[in-house]
UniProtKB/Swiss-Prot annotation:
It comes from Rattus norvegicus (Rat). Disulfide bonds: none annotated. Keywords: Apoptosis, Phosphoprotein. Involved in the induction of apoptosis. May act as a Ras effector protein. May suppress the serum-induced basal levels of NF-kappa-B. Residues 285-332 form the SARAH domain. The gene is Rassf6. GO terms for biological process: apoptotic process; positive regulation of apoptotic process; regulation of apoptotic process; signal transduction. InterPro entries: RA_dom, RASSF1-6, SARAH_dom, SARAH_RASSF6, Ubiquitin-like_domsf. This is Ras association domain-containing protein 6.
Length: 341
């Protein structure tokens, strides 16, 4: 990795209070990229904008940790990259091997299995095929509409509801319509009929971020990637450390630089997308969160006992000192009275 040009600023700000030197950034980048030596697409590299501003760019791992349901958009929208504000595509040199925005977006795709089923020969379909459906997270792509009520025969008075095979053109049109309404998160496909869901806690995704993007911009980028309607203000980014500590990123934080500072190992720290009101966990409390409730209760009981003992010790010392002071005052008063007489 080449050393940064001397024209770049001497310090790079992680937030309004924290900054790192160019040398520190060089070291962090080198450590990070060596860790992913065999995965060039995960490297974090730097370049400069049209106005000469230093910019660091790469893939950012984000883990799902939301509890509230999220709503997928019904219609896809053209994604607007934050890099449109930069000098593109000349922002980074070819030597930097910077990847394009659309790459590694394999989490957003249409189920090939559904397409194969929809285009399969008619002879392979059985009545059970049209009665089957997938789980809540994956709806059947070629689910056929029901026909009107039909009489079975003239002699039979009972009415039955019959499944009928729709025309081939109709099925293809329906498949195309469903394809427009789908997004996929970690391999699970959703359509407009099951577009409200909660992602599995701890499932991983990636977004392309840079050192110009603050916390809210990264959240917007993630929601845009999966076509999620919820407002970015409903969510926040948290760093969860291996110790159990959980810290909320500020609006002024640069998540990509925070990832660099924590190092490449996910066992040390992970960035989660969570509800904005998720509770933080301090470093003092973190060591106790994995203990059993009965054990924690015994610790509290022991602390209460120690507190009572300490209070009793302090009160005893206070009473002793108070008695000594009163005794001294009384002796001085007695001596003064004798002198006066």
């Amino acid at each position: 990795m080449t050393t940064m040009d001397h024209r770049f600023p001497s310090r790079i700000f992680v937030n309004e209070r924290t900054s790192i030197t160019r040398e520190q950034l060089n070291s962090l980048l080198e450590t990070y990229n060596v860790f992913y030596e065999n995965q060039k697409n995960l490297h974090i590299l730097y370049g400069q904008t049209e106005d000469g501003q230093l910019i660091v760019e790469g893939m950012l791992d984000i883990f799902w940790g939301v509890k509230r349901p999220i709503q997928l958009k019904i219609q896809d929208e053209k994604q607007i990259s934050s890099f449109d504000l930069l000098k593109s595509p000349e922002t980074f040199s070819s030597k930097g091997r910077m990847t394009r925005w659309g790459e590694f977006d394999d989490l957003y795709r249409i189920s090939e299995m559904d397409k194969t089923q929809a285009l399969a020969p008619e002879a392979r379909h059985t009545p059970e095929d049209y009665l089957s459906c997938y789980s809540v997270l994956k709806q059947c792509a070629d689910e056929e509409p029901e026909s009107p009520l039909l009489y079975r025969t003239v002699s039979e008075a009972a009415l039955v509801r019959k499944r009928m095979r729709a025309p081939e053109m109709y099925r293809k049109d329906r498949m195309g319509t469903l394809a427009k309404h789908r997004a996929s998160i970690n391999g699970h496909v959703y359509d407009h009929e099951t577009s409200i869901f909660t992602p599995t806690f701890g499932s991983e995704t990636k977004v392309r971020a840079n050192s110009i993007m603050k916390t809210e911009e990264v959240i917007k980028q993630l929601l845009q990637k999966f076509k999620i309607e919820n407002s970015p203000r409903d969510f926040a980014l948290y760093i969860i450390f291996g110790t159990g500590e959980k810290r909320k990123l500020k609006k002024t934080d640069v998540p990509l630089l925070q990832r660099l500072i924590q190092g490449p190992s996910k066992s040390n720290a992970r960035i989660f997308l969570m509800d904005k009101d998720a509770e933080e966990i301090s470093s003092d409390v973190a060591p106790y969160i994995n203990f059993h409730f009965s054990f924690l209760k015994s610790i509290l009981q022991r602390l209460d006992e120690e507190e009572k003992m300490e209070i009793e010790r302090i009160m005893a010392k206070f009473n002793t000192e108070r008695a000594f002071i009163l005794k001294c005052l009384q002796s001085k008063r007695a001596a003064k009275t004798e002198t006066t007489v």
